[in-house]
Structure formats: structure tokens, C-alpha cells
């Protein structure tokens, strides 16, 4: 690779006694796996920079599936995530690492990711709106095109008070049946604008994104969810799956 790229660390794991294998999300090359030689040494200049949620400038070399990281510099301090927002950020990182094909450019998604992490870092309330917006953006970049504003059966604009059932590869069709695939016109309009003014629209957004992301994630559970279970006190109720890690 020639030149520098903006990037974030999605995941890192030890490799040999002194090095790391790192999944990066870069602006121009998408998800890239690199080996950071010597990054685990106490005096390594890379050790402090290669942390999740730290904006980086990176360079690498090589043509195989795993590149050699040659340079990495922190552009700024890590975005401050803690508690529920930290687990939300880990969920976002795992989602990107799981669903993106390696070395495929997703420049617009890179900025959607950045905006999501910034929103989580600045969140004073629930992280859910930021998570739902990112999930919808991710689905759009994956080619999951859905018309939320028109009935797939008639072409008419959705009505706030009517119910529509989702049909894969078709869209939303007016229906009297209410089940887990049903949404009101009001909820669909919220999905289209990615604005969720209340609990009802947030829950509908979570329900839709869980359903839409399932084929990309397969049956393998998200590790970030298990981390949440492990570190959050048991007396505190767990958020529904997909809200955070």
C-alpha cells in the first residue's frame, strides 16, 4: 500500500510473544488484517496507538491475506467510551468485522462508523439511536435496499395507522396480521429517516435490524454480547440482544 490511510482497530489478538494480529477498518481498503510486529514489547511505539476507538493513520505492505503493518500513528486520543457505551462500541466493531468482506472499499461506511463512535462517546442517554442508525447505514452499504415509504403491493405511500408485513426481497405489504415482521406506517417512516422520537420507533428499528442482519451474522453468537453478560453485575437487567454488545 502506498501512502497513509485513516483507520480504526476493530480487534487485536496476540501473535507470537511480541506481536499482534489486528483487524483494521480503513477508509480506502475496508477491513484489513495486519500483523504488528513487536507491538507487544514494552518499549514499542505501536503499543499505545493500536487501541480500539483511537483514530489512526496507518501504512502496511504485503500482498497476502495478512499484511505487515509498517507504521501507525494516533491522530488523537481514543474516543472516550465507558460502561454501556463501551460495550456498544465493541458491538459495532464486532459487527463490522463479521459482515464486511476483506479488502473491499467502504469509504462512506467508514464515516458512518466514525459518526457512530463519536455519537456514543458524546451520548448522555441511551446509545440505541446511534446503534440503530449505524445498523441501517451498514445494511444500505451491503446492498440491502428497502423502500420503507411505499407499500410493495400497491405502490402507495405508507399510512401511519396501517400495518405492513415485511417480505424478504419484496418489501412491506399492507396486512391485517400483526407479528414480529409487522410494522406500522409511522414506524416505517422513522426507519426511512433514521430518526426515532420515542421508545416505540426505537423498538421497531431494533426489531427490523435484528431481522435484516441475521443472514449476515449466521448462527454464531456475538462475543461482545457474552462480554456484556460477564462484566455487568447480574442484578442489572441485560439489554435486549442487538441493543449493545
Curated annotation (Swiss-Prot):
Q: Which Gene3D superfamilies match?
A: Nucleic acid-binding proteins, Recombination protein O, C-terminal domain
Query: Which keywords describe this protein according to UniProt?
Result: DNA damage, DNA recombination, DNA repair
InterPro entries in UniProt: ARFGAP/RecO, DNA_rep/recomb_RecO_N, NA-bd_OB-fold, RecO, RecO_C
* Domain of life of the organism encoding this protein: Bacteria
Q: Which Pfam families match?
A: RecO_C, RecO_N
Q: Name one GO cellular component term.
A: bacterial nucleoid
| GO biological processes | DNA recombination; double-strand break repair
Q: Which residues form a coiled coil?
A: none
Report the NCBIfam families cross-referenced here: reco
Q: What does this protein do?
A: Involved in DNA repair and RecF pathway recombination.
What family is reported? Belongs to the RecO family.
State the protein's name: DNA repair protein RecO
Amino acid at each position: 500500500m502506498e501512502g497513509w490511510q485513516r483507520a480504526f482497530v476493530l480487534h487485536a489478538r496476540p501473535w507470537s510473544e511480541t506481536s499482534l494480529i489486528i483487524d483494521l477498518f480503513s477508509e480506502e481498503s475496508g477491513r484489513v488484517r495486519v500483523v504488528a510486529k513487536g507491538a507487544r514489547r514494552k518499549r514499542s511505539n505501536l503499543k499505545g496507538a493500536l487501541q480500539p476507538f483511537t483514530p489512526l493513520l496507518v501504512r502496511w505492505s504485503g500482498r497476502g491475506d495478512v499484511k505487515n503493518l509498517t507504521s501507525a500513528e494516533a491522530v488523537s486520543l481514543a474516543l472516550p467510551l465507558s460502561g454501556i457505551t463501551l460495550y456498544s462500541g465493541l458491538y459495532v466493531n464486532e459487527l463490522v468485522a463479521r459482515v464486511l468482506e476483506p479488502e473491499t472499499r467502504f469509504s462512506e461506511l467508514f464515516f458512518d462508523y466514525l459518526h457512530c463512535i463519536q455519537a456514543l462517546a458524546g451520548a448522555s442517554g441511551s446509545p440505541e439511536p446511534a446503534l440503530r442508525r449505524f445498523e441501517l447505514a451498514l445494511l444500505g452499504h451491503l446492498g440491502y435496499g428497502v423502500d420503507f415509504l411505499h407499500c410493495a403491493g400497491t405502490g402507495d405511500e405508507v399510512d401511519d395507522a396501517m400495518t405492513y408485513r415485511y417480505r424478504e426481497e419484496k418489501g412491506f405489504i399492507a396486512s391485517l396480521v400483526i407479528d414480529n415482521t409487522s410494522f406500522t406506517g409511522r414506524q416505517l417512516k422513522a426507519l426511512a429517516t433514521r430518526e426515532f422520537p420515542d421508545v416505540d420507533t426505537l423498538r421497531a428499528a431494533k426489531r427490523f435490524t435484528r431481522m435484516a442482519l441475521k443472514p449476515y451474522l449466521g448462527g454464531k453468537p456475538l462475543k461482545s454480547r457474552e462480554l456484556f453478560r460477564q462484566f455487568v453485575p447480574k442484578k442489572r437487567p441485560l439489554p435486549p440482544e442487538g441493543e449493545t454488545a
